[in-house]
């Protein structure tokens, strides 16, 4: 298992970016971070290197800043970067990383959970499975009840709530569209702590999946919106990926 930090110019973001990676061979996984973190947190706060080595998978950890992994009106195309440019760059840098759907997985926590599911629902042909830990999946809910950042912050990314609903950033609209079109979706894994203030986001998404008959693995466990919870909850998903090797 090799660890490396890559620096390259991103056409989507029009600047130099850095990506951390653990790389063995054969399999690939993407980990997206939360709103107040960066690309180093997975390796600093979890046992992801050991878990990935045991599973025999590569782990790619990009920095999404505070973008909600969205193409912003300011010109920074974070979603394009995460979902298109980054995978292409990784297969170019590492011979052992496969572009095949069955070899690619994506996971994230909080804001990153939203980003992971958006990538999986927008480009279901690219991922075998997607995992959201304590995901900020219901953006109107975040507008109304999660005031840590304030409404102006969410508006700067998504526009108004009225603009957001039904847009390409709306996970529930994407899920409905995919279900109605009979799209073969990646396997979906959701997990959230019972003391987490944004638990309603995961519950609502789970119920929507059930309503459309979409298979989903759902876990509620004791815990809050913190690394003590995420450190444990990412392990089953990594083991799942390893079982597919």
Question: For each predicted feature, which ranges?
Answer:
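Non-catalytic cap/lid and distal C-terminal segments of serine-dependent acyl enzymes
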Residues: 1-245
């Amino acid at each position: 298992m090799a660890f490396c930090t890559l620096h390259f110019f991103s056409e989507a973001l029009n600047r130099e970016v850095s990506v951390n990676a653990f790389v063995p061979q054969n399999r690939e996984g993407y980990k997206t971070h939360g709103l107040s973190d960066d690309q180093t947190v997975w390796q600093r706060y979890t046992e992801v290197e050991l878990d990935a080595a045991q599973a025999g998978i590569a782990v790619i950890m990009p920095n999404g800043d505070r973008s909600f992994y969205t193409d912003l009106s300011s010109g920074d195309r974070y979603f394009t970067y995460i979902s298109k440019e980054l995978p292409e760059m990784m297969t170019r840098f590492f011979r052992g990383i496969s572009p095949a759907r069955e070899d690619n997985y994506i996971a994230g926590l909080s804001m990153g959970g939203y980003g992971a599911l958006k990538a999986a629902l927008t480009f279901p042909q690219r991922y075998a499975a997607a995992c959201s830990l304590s995901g900020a999946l219901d953006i109107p809910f975040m507008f109304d009840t999660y005031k840590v950042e304030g409404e102006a912050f969410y508006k700067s990314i998504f526009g108004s709530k009225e603009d957001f609903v039904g847009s390409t950033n709306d996970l529930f609209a994407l899920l409905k569209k995919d279900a109605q079109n009979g799209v073969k979706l990646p396997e979906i894994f959701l997990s959230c702590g019972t003391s987490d203030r944004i638990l309603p986001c995961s519950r609502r998404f789970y119920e929507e999946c059930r309503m459309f008959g979409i298979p989903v693995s759902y876990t509620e466990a004791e815990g809050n919106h913190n690394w003590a919870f995420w450190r444990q909850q990412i392990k089953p998903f990594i083991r799942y990926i390893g079982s597919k090797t």
